[in-house]
Amino acid sequence: MATVPDLSSLSLYKVKTNSICSLASQIERRREVLKRQKEKRDEQFSQLRFLESEPEVIEEKKPQWPPRRHRRAHPHPPCPIEMMLAEWLFSVPEDLSSWFVIPCPRGQRCLVVVHSHRTHIYGKHGNLLRTMHTNLPKQTILYCIYDHRSSIYHILDMIMWNGQDYSTQIECQCRFFMLMSLAGDSRLTKSFQILSRTTVEEETWTNEAEDGYLFYHPLGFYETGYSPLVCWLKPFMIEDILQIHCSYPIVKPLGYTTAHDYMFNEQSNRKKEIFNKSKEEGEFVSMDQE
């Protein structure tokens, strides 16, 4: 069982104040997001109590499916929702032991969207990657990592399943519970496999993740764009950032000094990498490089 250090036990690195990886910035943004999401939950509860005395329709922002009258005119409908993207785990939260951790294989992040009869695969920027037939129920959206070598879609998160929306004010721990309950469902063929997950406290760190580790705050909603409630570390950063001993061999990149320096270098080079990188389709893309 892993022991997560307190923030006070970590040495504070000099950081760039304008960087998304700023220690103070990530801590504060994490608090602000949790506060805002709590306010949303409280508001929803208040509205539900109000409905007991006076009916009222509550409109929520849900994935936008193309109107039926336009579907024939658009053989490849646009992606109904955007991805939720991870930040580097630059600052270690005091409650990290309760966060979920998912070891991730190497592959390409994508959204699997099932319309009425066909399944569309979309990339990070909403670009259509491919179309195929699956056994998945219609009106289903899964956040996956596609492994080109095995042709397997590894499921990270569930945004919608069979018309049931999980993208609106549904906590991560609830989404993951519902997702794991689908294990063994006949509609999930061998091409779709749910990635294992556990809490940081229960993680043993005996097997190295091929690409890295995703960390999810248990109370976080699914929100598009970068979120401080979803964070990312490469395997060689775990001991440096979490101060946890890993049983797997640590292989660090050439010239590696510290995890924070590596993050800063990746952050400063991101625009250049995106500009020079060819289109995602048909490539292996590391999750921290997209």
Predicted regions and their residues:
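Covalent nucleotidyltransferase core used to form phosphodiester bonds in nucleic acids
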Residues: K62-D185
